[in-house]
């Protein structure tokens, strides 16, 4: 039971980064274009940032990756509608 709790606990920084990214993307008024280019650049930057300790699934910074994905999703869904 403790292993299940601790394994889920490791995903909280990525979830919080995604939610924070959605809020940031919702505040940005201009639509983000060339999403594919931003995602490729994000993967390259996340590779050089490396992962948090104890995250050995991917050699990427998953929190940075999920924050940028959250920014793009928040911008596409809300895009300056939130004050």
Curated annotation (Swiss-Prot):
It is a multi-pass membrane protein. It is found in: Cell membrane. The chain crosses the membrane at residues 4-24, 32-52, 54-74. One of its GO terms (cellular component) is plasma membrane. The keyword Transmembrane applies. Its main location: membrane. It comes from the Archaea. Keywords: Cell membrane, Membrane, Transmembrane, Transmembrane helix. This is Uncharacterized protein MJ1306. The lineage of its organism: Archaea, Methanobacteriati, Methanobacteriota, Methanomada group, Methanococci.
